[in-house]
């Protein structure tokens, strides 16, 4: 596998990321709903019109942004397509726990080039080495015999083995009848170390200024939960057990998060030099979205919890100089937003985006 990675490294260092800045993905024929690569050499982006989109480094979901290489490595880029335009909304990282030690896919160095971020790549099955291209257009199936019109797009996401021996991989799915939802199923290769947990965490809640966390009997406000915190580190509190999660009509545990701000407030940006120099944190979509996690009823155990942390200032890498940080307008917001559960091979999570406000989504979910 790593010999294949090293051969590709030479390509990566001669400007390939710039190629992907200019093209997010090619749609299939106009009468279909899917966003898929045209061929194996296209940028690695998959999704559905009017719904969720997922991509891998070095592809940028938003096209040509100066200085961009599609965002950090070691992450799934999760976006939303509306009216022909895709916007990046969040990232999802992979965080395996082995013998009490947790690794972070976006900040641990690659064994290929020593740069931060594990290499992720797509495949139509569980074999093959790294490529910066799509490798596969994805597989379309009909998962519901009672509704043969429903289609499901699936693709495998493979990644470098972690330093602690963890060797997980993902199967991503999007269903045509649930366009706002991304299925993420976790597996491990046979040579993987035993994982106590393998968290999938949405890492960029500050971008959407997520401040309201909806549980069964209460709404947690990040401004109150992290009130008074004004440092550059993450603020952490205890997780919430599955017993406190919402349930949808099928009995699935669900947790939702949204901004407390109106769209006009969310889209505004301070007009001062420190903020203008960090405009990539400005919220760019022309709509608000509710974000949520879900698990299937009966498909989880009592270890399932909701975990959030917070930040009062936007992330600025590992930089310890506080002058490189700017305050999140409006106060502390949730940054990492995730479900955690004891690992088992094949466990399934769903991450969703909806144009509906959380209260409206809860009523009809």
For each of these PLM feature ranges, what is it?
Residues 171, 177-238:
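Acidic (Asp/Glu-rich), glycine- and aromatic
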Residues 10-18:
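Bacterial N-terminal signal peptides
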Residues 21-25:
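Sec/Tat signal peptide C-region and signal peptidase I cleavage site
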Residues 27-52, 57-60, 244-365:
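Beta-strand-rich recognition/accessory modules
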Residues 105-117, 122, 225-271:
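Low-complexity, serine/threonine/proline-enriched polar segments
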Residues 112-180, 185-191, 195:
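Extended, loop-rich substrate-binding clefts of extracytoplasmic carbohydrate-active enzymes
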Residues 1-5:
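N-terminal secretory signal peptides that target proteins for export/translocation
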Residues 26-118:
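Beta-strand-rich N-terminal accessory domains
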């Amino acid at each position: 596998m790593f010999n294949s990675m090293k051969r590709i490294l030479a390509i990566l260092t001669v400007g390939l990321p710039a190629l992907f800045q200019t093209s997010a993905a090619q749609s299939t024929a106009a009468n279909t709903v899917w966003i898929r690569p045209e061929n194996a050499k296209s940028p690695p982006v998959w999704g559905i019109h009017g719904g969720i989109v997922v991509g891998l480094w070095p592809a940028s979901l938003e096209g040509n942004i100066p200085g961009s290489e599609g965002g950090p490595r070691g992450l799934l880029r999760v976006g939303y397509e509306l009216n022909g335009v895709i916007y990046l909304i969040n990232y999802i990282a992979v965080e395996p726990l082995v013998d009490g030690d947790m690794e972070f896919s976006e900040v641990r160095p690659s064994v290929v080039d020593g740069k931060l971020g594990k290499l992720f790549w797509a495949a139509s099955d569980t074999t093959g080495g790294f490529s910066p291209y799509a490798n596969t257009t994805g597989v379309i199936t009909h998962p519901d015999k009672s509704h043969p019109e429903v289609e499901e797009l699936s693709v495998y996401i493979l990644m470098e083995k972690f330093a602690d021996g963890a060797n997980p991989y993902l199967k991503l799915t999007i269903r045509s009848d649930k366009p706002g939802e991304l299925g993420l199923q976790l597996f491990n290769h046979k040579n993987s170390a035993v994982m106590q947990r393998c968290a999938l965490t949405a890492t960029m809640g500050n971008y959407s200024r997520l401040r309201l966390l909806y549980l069964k009997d209460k709404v947690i406000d990040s401004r109150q939960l992290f009130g008074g915190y004004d440092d550059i580190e993450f603020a952490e509190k205890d997780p919430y057990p599955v017993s406190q999660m919402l349930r949808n009509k099928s009995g699935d545990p669900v947790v939702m998060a949204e901004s407390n701000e109106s769209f006009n407030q969310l889209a505004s940006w301070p007009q001062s030099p420190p903020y203008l120099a960090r405009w990539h944190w400005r919220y760019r979509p022309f709509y608000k979205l509710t974000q949520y996690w879900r698990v299937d009823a009966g498909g989880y155990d009592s270890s399932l919890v909701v975990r959030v942390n917070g930040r009062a200032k936007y992330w600025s890498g590992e930089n310890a100089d506080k002058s490189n940080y700017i305050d999140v307008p409006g106060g502390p917001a949730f940054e990492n937003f995730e479900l955690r559960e004891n690992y088992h091979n094949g466990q399934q999570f769903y991450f969703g985006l909806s144009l509906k406000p959380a209260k409206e989504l809860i009523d009809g979910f």
